[in-house]
Amino acid sequence: DIRRVNVNIAATTVENYRKLKEAGIGTYILFQETYHKKAYEELHPTGPKHDYCYHTEAMDRAMEGGIDDVGIGVLFGLDKYRYEFAGLLMHAEHLEAVHGVGPHTISVPRLKKADDIDPTQFDNGIDDEIFSKIIACIRIAVPYTGMIISTRESEEVRKKALSMGISQISGASRTSVGGYTDEERPHDTEQFDVSDQRTLDEVVQWLMDLGYIPSFCTACYREGRTGDRFMALCKSGQIQNCCHPNALMTLAEYLTDYASPETRKSGEELIKEELTTIPNEKRMRIAGEHIESIYQSNKRDFYF
């Protein structure tokens, strides 16, 4: 049941971004790779990605084309991490200053082994301690953004990253072209080696064991809570009035449709406990009724 499609494609024109907006995409995501101009040009000596300015200004063109939810990121390890960190924050500051909307998400990938890449050939790799500090500092500096960490990181690293400020993680990812169409993971075309190879069910159970509420919510996009409206709700903290019950309702859907018996049992207990903590009594009652409908009547897609 796909309710939101985020798009990660190379930098393009305002006209093409407008087409994506008209098609109803969610967030447009593009990583800078490196903010260091000389390093960027050395890594992209030819081809359509060679133009540093065209790539760096992609989010400005995306917003000009009407896309107000954008996701940025930098590949830590290509250049000095302090420079990349500063560039990332300056990019976020620029988007908010010029367009009134900062990045909807910030991703923090770091250089990892891949089919034709040996990370030891690069001199600017960062260890787990520095990586955790970067995550914490981004969270402090850009408190409204969603922070993403992928399965290129291990379970141990992802656990610590969650406590440092990560709010979105992937599970059962496939990084090869057409990877989700195959029963077995095709390693020969993977973008990077997957370190956390647990199933989505295992990741969901793990998150609940750690005290988190796994959320599959897509409500903001469909309710028009994007761009500057989303920013205002996030900065004031009011977004939690929607996020909490929506997380519980979407978790109930996942548990009913996809979870193992063990995960479903744990999740239903968590939902029962969390429902009682919703401060607004009316919202608590409505959320509870919707969750019961999910369990008993096979109804879906409730959200505030």
Task: Give residue ranges: language-model regions.
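Glycine-rich tight-turn/loop motif centered on a GG-T
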Residues: 1, 40-52, 118-127, 187-193
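Radical SAM/AdoMet-radical enzyme domain recognition
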Residues: 1-75
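Mobile, glycine- and charge-enriched loop segments
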Residues: 2-8, 21, 26, 130-151, ...
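Residues that cap or flank secondary-structure elements
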Residues: 8-9, 50, 126, 149-150, ...
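Short Asp/Glu-rich motifs
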Residues: 16-17, 39-40, 81-83, 180-181, ...
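Short low-complexity, flexible loop/linker segments enriched in glycine and/or proline
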Residues: 21-23, 43-47, 84-88, 183-187, ...
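Conserved C-terminal portion of the radical SAM core fold
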Residues: 27, 32, 53-117, 127-156, ...
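Radical SAM enzyme core and accessory elements
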Residues: 156-167, 173-304
